[in-house]
Amino acid sequence: MNIGEASERSGLPSKTIRYYEDIGLIRPERGGNGYRDYAATDVHKLRFLQRSRGLGFSVEECRQLLALYEDKDRASADVRDIAQTKLTEIDRKIRELTELRRTLEHLVHACHGNDRPDCPILEELSDGA
């Protein structure tokens, strides 16, 4: 199938598919005319990559997960380690965002939001500069 059909079946834009090919995540066959010829296995890998990216895995983590998926002698512990590392990273980001939210919420409540020129939000931003 051509890249348009692979795009339609995988739900990924053609540009993303070409990028994944450029970085070696997929390797579609080339026909005698030089055009890419995507097989069902390529579309399956593209869907795998789409779901992996949707869960927040980096391109490099996707590369590792795809390699493990294709390795029938893999240890599930290796897959779990990658997922656990990502989960720890997500938890850290949630804590950071929660703290940012708390700070911003405090500043919003401290600001009168009226016609007066004084504003604790701007004062806080200025103090950090």
UniProtKB/Swiss-Prot annotation:
Family annotation (SMART domains): HTH_MERR
Subunit structure: Homodimer.
GO MF term list: copper ion binding; DNA binding; DNA-binding transcription factor activity
Main location class: cytoplasm
Start-end of DNA-binding region: 4-23
Keywords attached to this entry: Activator, Copper, Cytoplasm, DNA-binding, Repressor, Transcription, Transcription regulation
Biological function: Regulates the transcription of actP. It detects cytoplasmic copper stress and activates transcription in response to increasing copper concentrations. In the absence of copper, it negatively regulates the transcription of actP.
Native species: Rhizobium leguminosarum bv. viciae
This protein's GO CC annotations: cytoplasm
Compartment(s) of residence: Cytoplasm
GO biological process, one term: positive regulation of DNA-templated transcription
Signal peptide: none
UniProt-recorded name of the protein: HTH-type transcriptional regulator HmrR
Xref: Pfam families: MerR, MerR-DNA-bind
Residue span, HTH merR-type domain: 1-68
InterPro entries: CueR, DNA-bd_dom_put_sf, MerR-type_HTH_dom, MerR_fam, Tscrpt_reg_MerR_DNA-bd
